[in-house]
């Protein structure tokens, strides 16, 4: 069966890499897809090579039938990427988007440098100044999103990718699948609970409405994670995570925090302010001494960060195994 190609070339800005060739060309002749990079309930992300130019991209492939009631999310993601692509060096670029009879395709640049935390762990050292530089870059990109009326809603280390393996590669904010337009002038408050629980702000769980401050809460959680190797509200179960977030229960009591400056802790506290109206804005965060001033020399944080991360990962694996076993025993006893 011949597949219909519906080009949307308005996504491409002047000067952007052109993935589109002959507009009459039919899919699947335009791109050749390769290995799977990731996926979820509604989409698969694969490597894609443009046949004409041989350039590599990432293709987010969404089955129309599976997305039947979720197509607004796709349109929203495309609209957001169209607004911000190519205007900021630290935001993943949209290259093209189109549809076939069965699928929707979203083509973006291929970030080959890996995830933020993996890059950190592969290094021989990591200092507070390195964490500050990374968060300065990320906060600058978040400010750009907010200035353009966009809330990301799913900021976390897994969505911070390096453009290439080059040591000086740009760090990119990726995955705008949960992002949303938000105009302050409309006094519109988002209500949908979405994101990754450990990085979600308390107002999201309260269902009282939320906006741009949720991204700054996530900035605080990410900063805490980079400096320690664990998130501030890490708990054995998701229910306990949510309870800790709502109660704003976190500390700097672990020995790993003894070598972290009070300036860094103050930055985290102001991002993790329970009241969103008192939380740092992206603009204010960039003026905070942690991001705006040169950080003092500190000891290498990497050994502690690695140790804490691996210890909690092992604990969580064991906890999940015990929980699965107990669930299985309950089911077995019912029969």
From Swiss-Prot:
Important in cell cycle regulation. One of its GO terms (biological process) is signal transduction. It is an enzyme of class 2 (transferase). It is found in: Cytoplasm. PROSITE patterns: PROTEIN_KINASE_ATP, PROTEIN_KINASE_DOM, PROTEIN_KINASE_ST. SMART domains: S_TKc (SM00220). The modification Phosphothreonine is found at residue 192. InterPro entries: Kinase-like_dom_sf, Prot_kinase_dom, Protein_kinase_ATP_BS, Ser/Thr_kinase_AS. Residues 31-291 form the Protein kinase domain. The active site is at residue 154. ATP binds at residues 37-45. Coiled coil: none annotated. Gene3D superfamilies: Phosphorylase Kinase, domain 1, Transferase(Phosphotransferase) domain 1. Residues 310-334 are annotated as: Calmodulin-binding. Pfam families: Pkinase (PF00069). Belongs to the protein kinase superfamily. CAMK Ser/Thr protein kinase family. CaMK subfamily. The keyword S-adenosyl-L-methionine does not apply. The keyword Isomerase does not apply. This is Calcium/calmodulin-dependent protein kinase type I. Its EC number is 2.7.11.17. Keywords: ATP-binding, Calmodulin-binding, Cytoplasm, Kinase, Nucleotide-binding, Phosphoprotein, Serine/threonine-protein kinase, Transferase. It catalyses: L-seryl-[protein] + ATP = O-phospho-L-seryl-[protein] + ADP + H(+); L-threonyl-[protein] + ATP = O-phospho-L-threonyl-[protein] + ADP + H(+). GO terms for cellular component: cytoplasm; cytosol; nucleus. CDD domains: STKc_CAMK (cd05117). It comes from the Eukaryota. It comes from Schizosaccharomyces pombe (strain 972 / ATCC 24843) (Fission yeast).
């Amino acid at each position: 069966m011949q597949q219909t190609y519906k080009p949307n070339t308005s996504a491409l800005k002047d000067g952007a890499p052109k993935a589109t060739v002959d507009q009459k060309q039919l899919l699947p002749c335009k791109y050749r897809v390769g290995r799977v990079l990731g996926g979820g309930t509604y989409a698969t992300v694969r490597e894609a090579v443009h046949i004409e130019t041989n350039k590599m991209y990432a293709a987010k492939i969404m089955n129309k039938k599976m997305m039947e009631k979720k197509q607004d999310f796709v349109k929203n993601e495309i609209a957001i990427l169209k607004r911000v692509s190519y205007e900021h060096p630290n935001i993943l670029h949209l290259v093209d988007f189109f549809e076939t009879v069965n699928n929707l395709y979203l083509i973006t640049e291929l970030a080959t440098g890996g995830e933020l935390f993996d890059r950190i762990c592969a290094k021989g050292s990591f200092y507070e100044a390195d964490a500050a530089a990374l968060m300065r870059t990320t906060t600058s990109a978040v400010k750009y999103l907010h200035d353009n009326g966009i809330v990301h809603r799913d900021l976390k280390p897994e969505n911070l990718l390096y453009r290439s393996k080059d040591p000086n590669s740009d760090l990119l904010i990726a995955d705008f699948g949960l992002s949303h337009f938000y105009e302050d002038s409309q006094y519109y408050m988002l209500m949908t609970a979405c994101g990754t629980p450990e990085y979600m702000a308390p107002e999201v769980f309260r269902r009282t409405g939320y906006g741009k401050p949720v991204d700054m809460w996530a900035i605080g959680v990410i900063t805490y994670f980079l400096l320690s190797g664990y998130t501030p509200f890490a708990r054995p179960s998701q229910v306990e995570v949510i309870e800790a977030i709502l109660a704003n229960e976190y500390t700097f009591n672990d020995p790993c925090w003894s070598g972290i400056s009070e300036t860094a802790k103050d930055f985290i506290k102001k991002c993790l302010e329970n009241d969103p109206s008192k939380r740092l804005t992206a603009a204010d965060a960039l003026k905070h001494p942690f991001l705006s001033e040169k950080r003092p020399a500190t000891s290498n944080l990497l050994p502690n960060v690695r140790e804490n991360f691996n210890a909690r990962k092992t604990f969580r694996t064991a906890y999940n195994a015990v929980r699965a076993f107990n669930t299985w025993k309950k089911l077995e006893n019912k029969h």
